[in-house]
Amino acid sequence: MGLEQFKKYPLTFGPTPITSMKRLSKTLGGKVEIFAKREDCNSGLAFGGNKIRKLEYLIPEAIDGGYDTLVSIGGIQSNQTRQVAAVAAHLGLDCVLIQEDWVDYKDTMYDRVGNIELSRIVNADVRLDSSKFDIGIRPSFKNALEELTKKGKKPFPIPAGCSEHPYGGLGFVGCVEEIYEQEKQLGFKFDKIVVCTVTGSSFAGIIVGMALTGRQKDVIGIDASATPEKTKAQVLRIAQNTAKLIGLEKELTESDVNIDTRFAHPAYGIPNEGTIEAIKLCGATEGVLTDPVYEGKSMQGLIHLVRNNEIAEGSKVLYIHLGGAPALSAYSAYFKNT
């Protein structure tokens, strides 16, 4: 079985590179070697990111089914919606985006710059909604689908993070297949993999991919949702479904989902002092940009784990960089005095 049975529409450049983060590793004491899997530069479509990889397995259904409009949802600074909008433009499809008010952040430019600006540039129909943050299928999303159907359109639903779609986890099983090949080229295996998680399908796909070789407990998910119980339950559900799809013989349980909840505070989309410090440190040592919503918090978690010797000395750690830097301009107030 495996991934070969599923159609895949090419939207990425191919296997994403793994780069050594030597200066960051040295700055943190040199006891652990840090590497990055660069999903942040995986495509030429509106800066790419992890959702592009997932969409490669969803888009064949949209094309084969004759759908004319991609419909997706996220927060105002959603990476997901920006990537869906770019894919729609690339394919010549219409696109409707529901941008809910998930983040309690007051800035007059928040809904004008960053991801949402890029979505408008690629001609998506961007609709602001006052609903607050949660995971799962949202009423505003259902309403948009019903409205478009009544108007004679054929909308293709792409839920937040692609995570509620049955194929949402497949893309990151493919990411792990790339990692296995890259480990052979590098001549070593990674001891730990660190990845951000909110809606869960990136993390879930990596768990399933690593479970193919019994290494799923080496994956650390850094929660950025601030709703860790819901996130963990969703990750497990997606992982179990994805495992069945690819024919994984092992049954995954809650013990296979390792989520670190210490870095999501104070809320989804709001960085803490450690998040900003992590963004600056990663940028200053490596020239690699992370964002205040997702990757800044997972980078914060990685830095904390290394600094506090929570990862064994001599380990090689792979940080999965999921993208998200376009959101930085929406949070410029955090960096104005740097």
From Swiss-Prot:
Active-site residues from the entry: 78
Entry keyword Hydrolase: yes
Reactions catalysed: 1-aminocyclopropane-1-carboxylate + H2O = 2-oxobutanoate + NH4(+)
Modified residues (N6-(pyridoxal phosphate)lysine): 51
GO molecular function annotation: 1-aminocyclopropane-1-carboxylate deaminase activity; D-cysteine desulfhydrase activity; pyridoxal phosphate binding
Pfam families hit by this protein: PALP
Coiled coil start-end: none
Cofactors required: pyridoxal 5'-phosphate
GO annotation terms (biological process): amine catabolic process; cellular detoxification
UniProt EC number: 3.5.99.7
Function, in words: Catalyzes a cyclopropane ring-opening reaction, the irreversible conversion of 1-aminocyclopropane-1-carboxylate (ACC) to ammonia and alpha-ketobutyrate.
UniProt-recorded name of the protein: Probable 1-aminocyclopropane-1-carboxylate deaminase
Species per Swiss-Prot/TrEMBL record: Schizosaccharomyces pombe (strain 972 / ATCC 24843) (Fission yeast)
